[in-house]
Amino acid sequence: MEIVRVEPTPSPNTMKIVLNEKRKDNKSNTYTTILDNQPKFINDVLAVDGVKSIFYVMDFLAVDKKPKYDWEVLLPKVTATLSDESESIDTPAPDEHFGEVKAEVLQFKGIPYQVKLTSSSEEKRKQLPEVYIDSMLAAQKDDDNIVFQRKWENLGIRYGELDDIMSEVTEEILALYPEKDLNHLVENALNTDVVIPEKKYQHVTLETYQATDDWKERLRMLKAFPTPTERDFPLLGDAVSEEEKTPLRREAIVLLGMIEDKAVLPYLFKGLHDKSPAVRRTAGDCLSDLGFKQALPEMEKALDDPHKIVRWRAAMFIFDEGGPEQLDALRTHENDPAYEVKLQIEMAIARIENGDEALGSVWKQIANRNKS
């Protein structure tokens, strides 16, 4: 058995270790104590001082450490144990998804009733208020099968603590599907054969957007916005400056990230300085997807961000796009207190010092390949 790569996870106490072999029994187990009937390599890792538990599924381990232990000291011992060697991994692989939490909402005939969050190491679910459950059940016909007709709708990637994200996403869903509209959704579901209503896009102007002070109505406008262009900078720039509601600023950043022109950079830079770390990280992700090297100075500044999910994105961007000009900034931050960030900075320094080409993000590499 060999280690393919080590990946950080949104939990500071969990590391994901990808192996070159899959479990033959297709099962999953959590191990907390050494037992004779367990695989030897599991017991060997559990014997490492500081390891709390191991979750083993498919081709990876999620190793949990005790809070007082430092990954910088503990991880080499774990990897050495798995490798049957005294050395850890020579060339760790960059993780394109550090800190990401996938948000989804479960719908039946367009009526939402459950939210699910999934990180690399944890899943969390929450039912919406009872009126949504009742509406979902009321929309069911005699010959309907909820299990087969329900559908998970992807709400995109979020960042932060799962409890905070759950509160934010739930608030968004309640805003997008107000209780006053539920009766109409139920009536429509019962009177038509349409199982999932087609999403309708509607372009709005800055004047229309500003005509309402209701943030929920504004969010519905942004969620229904078609692919934006430079002509939409006034509206989206205003939304990015929204002081009250994080979902509005985040959605505006997501839309701005669709505009593949350098003129969008000042707006995304503003997002990099937002008061919400989730918005800052989203802006960083957009800059990474666009891959404009003009963003390098701003990403160097982001290495000082108070939240590690933002610092990690900055280090990853420099790994993807940076050159010798960024070495001073990287070396200044190479002792970052977050091990995941420190690892990414070390990888960026190594690539640049070795003279390896900056290939850009995986998304950018795919886009360039498709253009050729």
UniProtKB/Swiss-Prot annotation:
Entries under SMART domains matching the protein: EZ_HEAT, Nfu_N
Superkingdom of this protein's organism: Bacteria
Sample GO molecular function, one term: oxidoreductase activity
SUPFAM superfamilies, alphabetized: ARM repeat, Hypothetical protein SAV1430
Transmembrane segments: none
Protein family according to the UniProt entry: Belongs to the CvfC family.
Name of protein: Conserved virulence factor C
Originating organism: Staphylococcus saprophyticus subsp. saprophyticus (strain ATCC 15305 / DSM 20229 / NCIMB 8711 / NCTC 7292 / S-41)
Lineage: Bacteria, Bacillati, Bacillota, Bacilli, Bacillales
